Amino acid sequence: MSTTIRSNSKKKKMTLLQAIERVVELSEDSKMSQEFMKKAKAEIQLLAKSYGITERQVVLFCVCMEKGPNRVDYHDIASHLDMNKISVLGHASDIDALMHRRLLKYRDVKDEDDFDIPAVVIRSLKHNEIWGRFS
């Protein structure tokens, strides 16, 4: 499946990985600001619609993809976004939602601070497919 998004009045085909990469690039040191969200709007909306998740969850998922696939934690996310860890912990419910969608998994059931990207998610992205299509 190839996805199409509009960019500067031109249609541009973009894979899911390309959209994730763009969000990662634009989100670095962004503090998830409105300016960043506006710049990455097309990619964020594409991913949100594809995975059935919120825009904030898209950003967190993309950062986890960049920092993973193994042993991602709240500090990694905070460092990438240039936020303090407490602010990122405020988005724990979004991380939980990504777990529910099976886009992330806890590294250890006893430790909810570390998480991984499941191999099946990475494999599906390599083929530009959406893992766990939800209605």
PLM region spans:
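Intrinsically disordered, low-complexity N-terminal extensions of AAA+/P-loop NTPases
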Residues: M1-S135
